[in-house]
Design a protein with these regions (language model features):
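Residues that form or immediately flank small-molecule/cofactor binding pockets and catalytic motifs
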Residues: 8, 55, 88
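A structure-centric signal for secondary-structure junctions around beta-strands
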Residues: 27, 44, 68-69
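A residue-level signal for beta-strand positions that form part of recognition/binding surfaces
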Residues: 2, 57, 80
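A short, surface-exposed loop/turn module that caps and links secondary-structure elements
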Residues: 35-65
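Enriched for short, Lys/Arg-rich terminal
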Residues: 21, 62-101
Length: 101
């Protein structure tokens, strides 16, 4: 599967990098998504779906040990994975607007 970061994801990743978050943990989660290892995504990263989005927009906790409020938002279409954003639980409320733009 091809992984494609959206512009908003790149902006939010830059913000988290400036805050000294370990972005290699994002890469580990993305590799689990690529491998379709849903068992580990559910158990370790609390994979969830945001209702009302089409195609379905998923969120996973990047690093629950360090910060349980650090989420990766993504969706899949046409055998590709689109990384939408990095954020927190407050972003879930606003993600429909960002996602549908």
């Amino acid at each position: 599967m091809e992984v494609i970061p959206k512009k908003y994801f790149l902006r939010t990743a830059k913000k988290y990098k400036k805050k000294h978050y370990d972005l290699s943990k994002v890469n580990k989660v993305v590799s689990l998504i690529e491998k379709e290892d849903f068992e580990q995504l559910y158990a370790k990263h609390k994979l969830g779906v945001i209702r009302g989005t089409h195609p379905p927009l998923y969120h996973v906790h990047v690093d629950r040990a360090y910060n349980d409020d650090w989420l990766l938002f993504y969706f899949g279409a046409d055998n590709k994975i689109y990384l939408s954003a990095l954020g927190d639980h407050n972003l879930i409320e606003h993600i429909s607007k960002i996602f549908n733009d």
